[in-house]
Amino acid sequence: HVSLAKETGAAIVFGPTAQTSFKAIIAEDGQEFKIGVITIVALHTPGHTMESTTYLLRDENGKDYAIFSGDTLFLGDVGRPDLAQKGADMTQADLAGILFNSLRTKIMTLSDDLIVYPAHGAGSACGNNLSKETVGNRGEQKQTNYARRTDMTKEEFIKEVTDGLLPPPQYFPLNVKMNKEGYDDIS
């Protein structure tokens, strides 16, 4: 992201509470960004990390069209609530409860026909049930994503997303560091 911003002059946008050592816009929940005739709305969806943010794309008519859900919502799963919190004063259960609230108040209130673009698909340690698909819609996720069940209590959700979590991959602290500090450009 640092190299892309440098090459294009585009701003880097992070969610609320993010701390970086490079120039970035720290978006507020609900903050809107205009790009031509479309609008991007930052929806603060903490739980995977405290700065996790979902970006809602509104078309030229102001209609909600898609979400870029990062690691908050995957196709088939949600982001595990422990990877970026080493040393924080929060437990996995605390973060899972925050993630539950984010899903219920920010994402599950959106239209079923909304396109969902997660950060990535299967092959990551970020969740146990990530789909190989890289694009879907919110309605499909309501039917197929265990974490989106409307009858699931907060306590059930916390247990479901925290049971059986393996230790974070050894490389993950480096990922967190690069997100905050940038990286050496090798181009």
Regions found by a protein language model. Give the residues of each.
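N-terminal, helix-rich and Lys/Arg-enriched segments in bacterial and organellar proteins
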Residues: 4-14, 55, 66-68, 117-118, ...
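Glycine/alanine-rich phosphate-binding loops at beta-alpha junctions
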Residues: 1-41
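Mixed-charge, polar/low-complexity N-terminal
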Residues: 6-8, 13-15, 19-21, 48, ...
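Catalytic core of the metallo-beta-lactamase
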Residues: 24-114, 121-129, 137
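Accessory terminal helices/loops
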Residues: 89-90, 94-187
